[in-house]
Regions:
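Solvent-exposed soluble domains appended to multi-pass membrane proteins
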Residues: 1-328
Length: 328
């Protein structure tokens, strides 16, 4: 599972953490990286892979200006950005949003048309399960029904959508299983859904007001998978990892070239495997508030300095730190 900065929304900040390795916990409270801070070129996974000859493409079947993506994506290293205008207007939709299956059909079409042997980094943000979940769709069959009065229609609707996502994901994995070109797929959730408190209390078995910090953090965790159609160094020690480490973990497990910043993040993860705006978890599994002064404070402060250089110090961004030329 990966730990995110918030629950119920804010997809772009999850994108930012994965793509840059930076943490939203270092931004002002309720800050948004895409709309407030990415005003110039910022190093990212896209820019690193671009240095190594990859074409870089972002794809999100929604309006291009959502979360300022049409401005941000070029600044963080993407050559091109496909939005909802690239989709078949008559394509499958649930609740007005393009289905995951329709989204993945577009990805398959892109891969079928790309130049053979030319490496491609494609960053896709799906839209099917976008909130809210109050209104039913007569064209969508809700197959999940939890037999408990606290399991509301919205919860059942959301879980039915996730079930549909599972089916679509299986299909695209099967597609890449049959491709000769080495391919890596990283899939992770952007945030937990915004559902009624009564449903979450059903899951916890207690009032949300009585949750410990450790229990609260469960509302900020989502599943992830790193898969490849060839043998990779699969790890079993990734039960708890925050999104800012996820791209570095992917580079490590697949033996792709890393920057010194990636190496710093992987070393930091050994001490602080997960952190977000609520706090962090140390190597022994103990939860801490960000305001605590302890043996991890110096490391977290160093991390904040490096993030400042990446995001804020546009005239002095360290090419040695964020470039792959000096990495492994």
């Amino acid at each position: 599972y990966t730990t995110l900065f918030r629950s119920g929304g804010g997809t772009s900040n999850s994108e930012y953490e994965f793509l840059t390795g930076n943490s939203v916990s270092s931004l002002p409270l309720n800050g948004n990286a895409y709309t407030q801070f990415v005003k110039h070129k910022v190093p990212s996974l896209a820019s690193q892979l671009k240095q190594q000859g990859y074409d870089t493409l972002a794809f999100h079947p929604y309006k291009a200006h959502g979360w300022n993506r049409d401005t941000v994506y070029p600044l963080i290293g993407f050559d091109n950005f496909l939005d909802e205008t690239s989709m078949n207007p008559n394509g499958e939709k649930f609740r007005g949003w393009y289905s995951d299956a329709e989204d993945y059909n577009k990805i398959i079409d892109i891969f079928n048309k790309k130049k053979a042997g030319q490496p491609l980094f494609l960053f896709n943000v799906t839209i099917q399960n976008h909130g809210g979940y109050l209104i039913a769709d007569k064209n969508f069959k809700e197959e999940i029904k939890i037999k408990d009065e606290k399991a509301t229609d919205t919860a059942n609707r959301y879980l039915s959508l996730i079930h549909e996502s599972d089916r679509a994901f299986e299909k695209i994995i099967n597609y890449f299983k049959n491709q000769k070109e080495p391919t890596i797929v990283v899939m992770f959730g952007d945030h937990q859904p915004k559902l009624e408190d009564s449903f979450y209390e059903l899951l916890y078995g207690k009032s949300l007001n009585s949750l410990s910090l450790k229990e609260l953090q469960k509302k900020y965790t989502v599943p992830f998978i790193i898969w490849a159609n060839y043998d990779i160094d699969a790890k079993s020690d990734v039960e708890n990892v925050s999104a800012n480490y996820l791209s570095s973990l992917m580079l490590q497990q697949t033996n792709l070239k890393m920057s010194r910043y990636n190496e710093f993040l992987l070393n930091m993860r050994n001490e602080v495997p997960a952190l977000n705006a609520n706090g962090y978890v140390d190597k022994d599994g103990k939860n801490h508030e960000l305001s605590e002064n302890n043996e991890y404070t110096k490391l977290i402060t160093q991390y904040q300095y490096l993030q400042y250089n990446s995001l804020m110090d546009k005239k002095h961004v360290s090419t040695d730190l964020f470039s792959v030329k000096d990495g492994k």
